[in-house]
């Protein structure tokens, strides 16, 4: 799952997958803006056929946050 998430993030952020790890901060390290985050969440929701509640989206700061959320909901 981690590798799939990193691949999605790399595509949205337009960076090499190798530059992303669990501790990578989506905003500080990858310079993602709000529209990028919406795109990222949408792609993850489509891939895993689930809806991430807004309150959970606001908590997501790192790749690890996404992986942890999905691990407990997929």
What does each of the following model-derived ranges do?
Residues 13-31, 48-59:
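Phosphopantetheine carrier-protein modules
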Residues 1-18, 71-73:
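Thiotemplate assembly-line natural product biosynthesis machinery
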């Amino acid at each position: 799952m981690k590798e799939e998430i990193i691949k999605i993030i790399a595509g949205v952020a337009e960076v090499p997958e190798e530059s992303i790890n669990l501790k990578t901060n989506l905003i500080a390290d990858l310079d993602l803006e709000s529209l990028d985050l919406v795109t990222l969440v949408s792609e993850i929701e489509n891939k895993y056929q689930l809806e991430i509640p807004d309150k959970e989206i606001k908590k997501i700061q790192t790749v690890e946050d996404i992986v942890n959320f999905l691990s407990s909901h997929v």
